[in-house]
Amino acid sequence: MAVSVADRNSFTYICAMQHITESIRELYKKWKGSAPVSLDVLPQSGSERRYFRLYDNHQSVIGTYGANIKENETFIYFSQQFQQKLLAVPEILAVSEDKQYYLQEDFGNISLLNKLEEGGFTTPVYDLFKKSLEALAKLQVKGDKGLDYEQCLTNKEFGKQAIMADLLYFKYYFLDALRKPYDKQKLMDDFEALSNYLSHTEYKYFMFRDFQSRNIMVKEDDSIHFIDYQGGMKGAPQYDVASMLWQARANLPDAWKYDLLEDYIDAFENTIGQSVNRNIFQNQYNGYVLIRLLQVLGAYGFRGLFERKAQFLTSIPLALTNLKEFYLNQSLGIIVPEFNKVLTLCVADEVIHQFTPVQAHEKTPLVVKVKSFSYRNGVPVDDSGNGGGFVFDCRGILNPGRVESMKTQTGRDKQVKDFLEQQTKMTEFLNSVFDIVDISVEDYIKRDFENLSISFGCTGGQHRSVYAADALVRHLKNKFKVRIELEHLVQDAKNWINASTPSK
């Protein structure tokens, strides 16, 4: 019997994951002397690394698989060096001979960002941010001593070249996409001047590079621990502070930004054992805030405007608002006239409005009805009287139901979601769906229409259509704040209980 491409891909995925988990288990056994009692696959982050939590009866550890051996070596080296100095990083417990697998200390599941989202702008959360910045100062200064920067993953130092790269990233992937007039040569001259100014800082220590609240873990005793610093290099300490305090998703109040910066400078002075010129330190900090904000806009522009990924497009208005708030209230300490002209163009109300979607309000009559269904039962009827709406066929997406371990699961189960996000073209499919649907939703909100029907179908109405319908609901709520009625026709009828039957 012929084997389909879907079957081959499913088999390849299963074999690859089985090999990885077996290798992680074997490394654990060599380290501990016994096999783990259980192993959980953790959600994959933005990188290609895979994480696992391994348990015995008393503790858990994190297992990591990474095909990029250089990246693994950098993280392991930094961790071992920092651990010797009792800094807030995980202990490396074991490393495989091929350096593709390693075990590290487990700090739990709760990040500083989780604490902020749960607790809001409260004193206990502020104290965690302050504690994180105090630990950062120690990591930067003490971690720098004796560190071999030849071990860095990319550049050894965040100097003029790296600063220019971030500025050009913003220029090519966001500024030029606006098609606004500016003097290109004068702007390049200003980029050169700003890069020189920021690279000639008095203080250069270890720079985390991606110091954000999602990379800071908080244990039950409120102790602070850092992860994901393998992109670190030598650089200005202000960059990491700027990354944390101006993280768009955290959206910290101005008072917090000011007070936490003062807290950090106090901690930095205590760590280096001398006072700093706060005016100069603040001006250079402002420069790095700007670099970070522009780098983020470049990333959103590349992912959103060029790759057409909807979630990045919806992030642009907040990033522009952040940039406007900073630009109108802070000084760089350097004269860059064409650069200032460009920033004024970028934060103009018309540009922010250009990227801000129309949103529903309390009196908006529109209700979007989203359904998942099985093609075996036919396309669902639109009972609004409009004769139908969008129907998207998910059967071209590789089917998780062909994998034995996922046959009785649904599009809401973690293993299925991981499979669809990592092993199929579901993300590309949904980005195209979002582009199509957004046009109608925006128009219907403006014109006070009352109904829009959107349905997703697959073979059994269990995996792909369920995942896609849920994803669209999240997208529409986040972007348009519109009222939605969600119905999973097959799963609701079965009370989400699925027998193990063959899928096609």
Regions found by a protein language model. Name each.
Residues E450-V473:
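Catalytic cysteine-centered active loop of the rhodanese-like fold, especially the PTP/DSP P-loop
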Residues G298-Q359:
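ATP/Mg2+ or Mg2+-diphosphate-binding catalytic cores
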Residues F52-A165, D176:
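ATP-binding pocket architecture of kinase catalytic cores
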Residues F11-Y101, Y205, K219-I224, C346-V347:
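Conserved NTP-binding catalytic cores of kinases and kinase-like/nucleotidyltransferase enzymes
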Residues A2, R50-L54, L139, L194-V241, ...:
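Active-site acidic catalytic loop and adjacent metal/ATP-binding pocket
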Residues I24-W31, D144-K156, Q161, D166-F206, ...:
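An alpha-helical support segment within catalytic cores of ATP-dependent transferases
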Residues T356-L452, D492-K494:
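C-terminal accessory "lid"/substrate-recognition subdomains
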Residues L168-A177, Q238-Q274, L290-F306, A319-Y327:
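Active-site activation/catalytic loop segments of kinase-like enzymes and analogous catalytic loops
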